[in-house]
Amino acid sequence: MRVDFLKILFALTLTIAGIAPAMAEEPGVHRFATYNIRYVNANNGDTGDKLWANRRTAVTNIVKDYDFDIVGFQEVTGNNKDSQTGKSQLQDLIDMLPAYDNYAVEREGKNYSYNAIFYKKSKYTVVDKGMWYINEHPSTPGLSWKYFGDANTIARTLEWILFRDNASQTEFYFACTHMNYSLASSGVYGAELNARMLRELVGETPVVLVGDFNMHRSHEDTYRNYMSQFYDAALHTTTTCNPKGNITHTGSNWYPATNANCSGSEFDYQFYDNIVPLSREIITEDYNRAIAPSDHFPVLVRYKFQDTPSPTSYQVTNTDELLVAVAKATMNDTIYLAQGEYELDATIQPTVSLTFVGGYDKQFSDVVGVSKLRQKEAKQVFNIPQYYSLTLYNLHLENGSSTSALGGGLLAINGSKLNLYNCRFSNSQSTTNAGALYANTHDTYIENCVFDNDTAKTSGGAIYAETMESLTIIDSKFHHNGCTTGAALYVNGGRVLNIQCNGFYDNISNKQGALTIVADQYSAAAHLVNNSFLNNQLIAKKGLATATKDFGGAGLYAKMNNDTQLFNIAHCSFIGNHTVFAGTKANFGGGALRIAQGKSCMMNNLLLANAEKASDTEYEYVDYTIANAETLWRNTENLLSSSESIADWENDLVNTIAGLWNGKVFTADVRENGTYVLKSKMLNGFNLCYLTTNHRLCESAFGFDIDGDGNKSNYLKYDQIHNTRAIKACVGALEYKEGATSITEVQPQDGIQQVDEHQYILTGAPNVTVYNLAGQCVLSSNNETIDLSPLPSGLYIVNQHKIIR
């Protein structure tokens, strides 16, 4: 056998020098790295061994010695040539890494600073490539959200390549970015843009995103954007230092990893999806130079293209089995719970993303009800760390409590995504925020849930939602909750708020509505469709009213970030909400709703018998206080109270409306209070008939851009209980379903009349005609009187009438 002594001698030489020669990698493994190599900066203190001329060999040797298949470089200078070599960093990398080809994009069009992807040209074929700028207009060079005052004057980009692995023919994406170091605004918005656009680009194709992200994992809003779409390799592999040191940060501060002065942040990440990470290494090689080759260490992750492990499922019938399943569960597993009650004396704290599905029969063959998770102690039921997601189906969480600064009496999540379906959160409390649910997530989705009898001290009697991207709440009920601000729901932030087909009733706040929305994002938009706000109260505490003018809106209070942000309200009912304030009346506004700031548009809403009063005065009609009212009400169709509809005392405000509709106009769950006295009142008949006959309540003219893609869609086809609306729809959250098609004879002066079990006689001019609210003629007479008692209880349009008993 022939022995190659030169190769042995070379390997021994490397070992003696402290350099580990690259070992042959197993087949099918791909070695991907990220490396910020520090730009040429001789004018600002980079001298001696920090000069690029004195470290370029170490930088490129790391790439070769540690056998990087693909590496994403950051801070690669193009036109700023080293004074000793006469070359730019980019040219040196090209010359010194001949086995690699590259895709390098300059960030500002000035040949100054690049993100550069270098890849082994023998191992991969480029199928496609591209880039975008990290700003409000990704196809155009420019600074990222600079008008937010970021201390940053460098444009940021993301570069991507669609590769084909020559051995397996597998296609995958590799992307590289260098994020803004100002996290106050553009870091957050840039992260959202990168994560969203990269997901749209790659779909379900394997992808690895590397770079210097200038963030810690504790920077929740920024980090959560990436975690909402991808996985962090550091959390799903074991990290080692190669060849020396015991550090977790990736910044070096120029010191070797074994030096006590070696310090820095973990700014360098690899995010991935649909590919399996095998190991992660912080490459601490310095070639015995007593100085690191850059102020960042490169990070290497070994990947393999293989099927990701299938999630495991668990079936539990009691509390002990539930806790064991949570302890055993791995990423994206599902735990199925049999119907029944599970008493807890500790908080469930998963360290992975999980789904819980309750309500199964004993054979786990079908969902037959719900599973109740009840706290015996004054603790939360769930607490989810910032990295993970949670999905709940068919659960009733009850009797929780929180004293933490964030709150969340039953559930607190600082994670990526929260999804709730057919769940109930009840009888919980918090000494701070969020009596039931604290949701600090990238996305939150709530459907067909109930939040009742939950209280908090500060904000969000039931929910405090602090979403980065989207908050969607559909078909849910909020009742008998209480808090200073946002008696039922307090929303802080969110790019898209979509609140449809919900009921907010009998909630009590002390400052701002049952629903309070404070949207602090630059591009936020809020859409409220088919919601009912009934009998909510704002009872101000003494002393509060003189401190600020941000009071009012017992049903809804909203304040967008600026006057250009959209706030759309359509087919909503605001009825019987009222405000009692102490102190200066000018500090309050709106018995039903107050929109303090935003570009508002309202269409086809019902605002009736809402009022406000000082503690020592009578109620007076105030349905709303809205900024920019002239623009708001132009060419819209909303039915407001008239002076005749104002009750003389508090109970009449609610009793009148509750009696009129007897629950039918809202939701089946809104129960009539036994103390209500059914009354008959004429409610602004001129407006109602005028709208019905002339404006036709055209839903087609009012669309929403729910997902923020710039395309408006019509979300008014269905009413609050998902019945298809007639072409000539009724105002408010629910449409009457008497089956008629048109109104042809009703005149603008006609009124709306309640008929109940009492016998009412109408008298007036001859030819009295009675219509239901869908426009069908149900009674007519050539006489001056007509007996309404044969009609079912309900609302009717009657022309030329007076009322007698």
What role is predicted for each listed range?
Residues 23-95, 107, 112, 265, ...:
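N-terminal, active-site-proximal structural segment of metallo-dependent hydrolase catalytic domains
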Residues 76-171, 283:
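Structured beta-strand-rich core segments of catalytic domains in phosphoester-bond hydrolases
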Residues 185, 189, 199-208, 215-309:
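Metal-dependent phosphoester-hydrolase catalytic domains
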Residues 308, 686-742:
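Surface beta-loop-beta hairpin patches that serve as ligand-binding interfaces in beta-rich domains
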Residues 319-323, 332-355, 359-362:
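N-terminal extracellular ligand-recognition/capping segment immediately after the signal peptide
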Residues 351, 419, 446, 455, ...:
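Predominantly extracellular beta-rich ligand-binding scaffolds that present long acidic/polar faces
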Residues 353-405, 429:
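Right-handed parallel beta-helix/beta-spiral solenoid domain characteristic of secreted/periplasmic
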Residues 744-805:
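C-terminal outer-membrane/trafficking sorting elements
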